[in-house]
Amino acid sequence: MAKITKEIVFGNHKLILETGEVARQADGAVMASMNGTQVLVTVVWKKDSGESNDFFPLTVNYQEKFYAIGKIPGGFNKREGRPSDNETLISRLIDRPIRPLFPDNFFNEVQIIATVLSLNPEVSPDIIAMIGASAALSISGVPFNGPIGAARVGYKDGVYLLNPSRKEQEESKLDLVIAGTKDAILMVESEAQELSEDIMRGAMLYGHEMMKSVIKSIEELAREVGKSKPEWKAPEIDTVLKARINDVARNEVEAAYLIKDKQQRYQRLDELREQTISALLAENDELNADVIANMFGELERSIVRNRILDGEPRIDGRDHRTVRPISIRTKFLERTHGSCLFTRGETQAIVVATLGNERDAQILDGISGETRDRFMLHYNFPPYSVGETGQVGSPKRREIGHGRLAKRALMAVLPDTNEFPYVLRIVSEITESNGSSSMATVCGTSLALMDAGVPLKAPVAGVAMGLIKEGDRYAVLTDILGDEDHLGDMDFKVAGTEKGITALQMDIKISGITNEIMERALEQALEGRTHILGVMNNALAEHRTELSQHAPRITTMKVAEDKIRTIIGKGGATIKGLIESTGVSIDIDDSGVIQLFSPDKMALEEAQKQIKALIAEIEVGQTYQGKVSKIVDFGAFINLLPGKDGLLHISQICAERTQKVEEVLQEGQEIEVFVAGIDKQGRVKLEWKDKPQAEAKEVEGASVSATFLTMEEQSEEINSGNKISEEEE
């Protein structure tokens, strides 16, 4: 096949889609490029019927290669290893908008691999990978109701930005990724700095409009080189069997969905499913139990959806706008730095905040460069939270994604580093789940941080919205249950403060939603969020003024850059000695900012005292309590400050010239001395007197900054012929 190229003007960039040259044995392969960032996306799908599957086995693997940026991977093996969290998140970003566009009951295996081959650090590869996946699917011949487009939207000074550069993104108040078909939005993922509902809705509409040129070009590419799609038809529905299941089970299923307790309801539905399968197999043993079970599930879906659309109470008895009952306990765990038990209906999370120092920050080494993450949020979803057994171990894709969403919701309200220099780690343990556990994590995180004494700019709450839509009838649901998520058409999570939205995630399972529905969902989400914030404020209105007694303390000092060497010492000896003597962790950066970290307040104060002594200047006219460090023929060296000595001449020690210094002073002896002067070489002249004499008053209070000589350096100066004479006194 000849190489085919499509060029699209996309914001300030030129997007190039190429096929026919690379990976020609894949069903679909597209090289997507934008200003030096190149991503190869391939699609392969199995042509067998997939009848052995009862789910759609779609796999998306996004991978970044270090050679793309001219780097060699770290580690012993010097090659790329398991996917990073960022790669996992982008894999999910590609998966979410394309999955709903495959036909119902299409169970053939499909694999998409997106590989970053070249990276311009100013151009993020995620949008390029999403567009490349859409193009590769569109030419692969797989049944796919696309294509989709994707775009990133920023917001600065009242203007929306299309696919902003990395520098522009740093100045933007919004980072929104949107994907959809030419007719409808399918997926939104965003982080914002407390923006209004209208601004967020406008960003979604703007991004959707801008991506239509990309969709048009992919359609043209598919017409030119796309493989013919097989005539795929969903298996025919056995209408007789469907009617029989309805007759046998409908009344009992309707009654089961009046049971408000999740576990009791599930137990009853399991019993009814097994009874229905047994009854129908007894009537006709040629029937397939899996087919009966699937039709039973369709009956459940129909009952729940129609009841909601008819205006009847939801599964747990609520109306469409009511949030489930909330209970909150802060200081839930005794020895943690901050903790919260957040319960909303049958969804519950124990959220724990831990404070650390700069050394606890996570170092992330990716192709975009090395970064330090000072705010970590880890979300755990153990199987017991839904009453099941299962494997426990490394976080799955869903856990990584939920943790990332909750983290983005809090980023806008975290204090500045100079105000609160701690590194923060949050762990959310989901102990019960019946929908919206990620939003429970958002609420619990806000409370746990305030419980730990973190001065958040504002509390943050989150709520998950749902949608039931049949034709022109629809209902938007606030604070959805797990069943309403599973049986519904939308999962729309919104988090924010009283002032505005900080994070938003939307996944649509149908062909799309109207602007009216989106506006209704945002309006109800604001109402629900405001209610939840009120409950949270009743439990803990402000952050604790004192840190937990179990939390470490951090003190920050700023010293002149020319003092850094003094504090570190030769080969790091001085700073190591400070750490060993005080037990305090000490970090100093190139700008002279020192961070002291210890659970012991007294140790922190001692370390501060020693550092101040290290960098202190000797002042002429001041009196110091010094220690005799060395005795020589012409006097004694007195240590005034760490690393700073002065000479007490023999004339200031002995009344008689024949008297020896050793007869008056001994090494280690402490005496009070007066700084009489500092010469151009930085040598300090001392007097052994109770108070300054009259002639010293001329310099009283004067401060002289100089390069002070140590005892050894002064001794060398004197021995080399620069001896301080009595006449100089």
From Swiss-Prot:
<dbReference type="Pfam" id="PF01138">
    <property type="entry name" value="RNase_PH"/>
</dbReference>
<keyword id="KW-0479">Metal-binding</keyword>
<dbReference type="InterPro" id="IPR015847">
    <property type="entry name" value="ExoRNase_PH_dom2"/>
</dbReference>
<feature type="domain" description="KH">
    <location>
        <begin position="552"/>
        <end position="611"/>
    </location>
</feature>
<dbReference type="InterPro" id="IPR004088">
    <property type="entry name" value="KH_dom_type_1"/>
</dbReference>
<feature type="binding site">
    <location>
        <position position="491"/>
    </location>
    <ligand>
        <name>Mg(2+)</name>
    </ligand>
</feature>
<dbReference type="InterPro" id="IPR036612">
    <property type="entry name" value="KH_dom_type_1_sf"/>
</dbReference>
<keyword id="KW-0808">Transferase</keyword>
<feature type="domain" description="S1 motif">
    <location>
        <begin position="621"/>
        <end position="689"/>
    </location>
</feature>
<dbReference type="GO" id="GO:0000287">
    <property type="term" value="F:magnesium ion binding"/>
</dbReference>
<keyword id="KW-0963">Cytoplasm</keyword>
<dbReference type="Pfam" id="PF00575">
    <property type="entry name" value="S1"/>
</dbReference>
<keyword id="KW-0548">Nucleotidyltransferase</keyword>
<feature type="region of interest" description="Disordered">
    <location>
        <begin position="710"/>
        <end position="729"/>
    </location>
</feature>
<dbReference type="InterPro" id="IPR012162">
    <property type="entry name" value="PNPase"/>
</dbReference>
<dbReference type="InterPro" id="IPR012340">
    <property type="entry name" value="NA-bd_OB-fold"/>
</dbReference>
<feature type="binding site">
    <location>
        <position position="485"/>
    </location>
    <ligand>
        <name>Mg(2+)</name>
    </ligand>
</feature>
<dbReference type="InterPro" id="IPR020568">
    <property type="entry name" value="Ribosomal_Su5_D2-typ_SF"/>
</dbReference>
<dbReference type="InterPro" id="IPR004087">
    <property type="entry name" value="KH_dom"/>
</dbReference>
<dbReference type="Pfam" id="PF00013">
    <property type="entry name" value="KH_1"/>
</dbReference>
<dbReference type="InterPro" id="IPR027408">
    <property type="entry name" value="PNPase/RNase_PH_dom_sf"/>
</dbReference>
<dbReference type="GO" id="GO:0000175">
    <property type="term" value="F:3'-5'-RNA exonuclease activity"/>
</dbReference>
<keyword id="KW-0460">Magnesium</keyword>
<protein>
    <recommendedName>
        <fullName>Polyribonucleotide nucleotidyltransferase</fullName>
        <ecNumber>2.7.7.8</ecNumber>
    </recommendedName>
</protein>
<comment type="subunit">
    <text>Component of the RNA degradosome, which is a multiprotein complex involved in RNA processing and mRNA degradation.</text>
</comment>
<dbReference type="InterPro" id="IPR015848">
    <property type="entry name" value="PNPase_PH_RNA-bd_bac/org-type"/>
</dbReference>
<dbReference type="InterPro" id="IPR036345">
    <property type="entry name" value="ExoRNase_PH_dom2_sf"/>
</dbReference>
<dbReference type="InterPro" id="IPR001247">
    <property type="entry name" value="ExoRNase_PH_dom1"/>
</dbReference>
<dbReference type="GO" id="GO:0006402">
    <property type="term" value="P:mRNA catabolic process"/>
</dbReference>
<dbReference type="GO" id="GO:0006396">
    <property type="term" value="P:RNA processing"/>
</dbReference>
<dbReference type="GO" id="GO:0004654">
    <property type="term" value="F:polyribonucleotide nucleotidyltransferase activity"/>
</dbReference>
<keyword id="KW-0694">RNA-binding</keyword>
<dbReference type="InterPro" id="IPR003029">
    <property type="entry name" value="S1_domain"/>
</dbReference>
<comment type="similarity">
    <text>Belongs to the polyribonucleotide nucleotidyltransferase family.</text>
</comment>
<comment type="function">
    <text>Involved in mRNA degradation. Catalyzes the phosphorolysis of single-stranded polyribonucleotides processively in the 3'- to 5'-direction.</text>
</comment>
<dbReference type="Pfam" id="PF03726">
    <property type="entry name" value="PNPase"/>
</dbReference>
<dbReference type="Pfam" id="PF03725">
    <property type="entry name" value="RNase_PH_C"/>
</dbReference>
<dbReference type="GO" id="GO:0005829">
    <property type="term" value="C:cytosol"/>
</dbReference>
<dbReference type="GO" id="GO:0003723">
    <property type="term" value="F:RNA binding"/>
</dbReference>
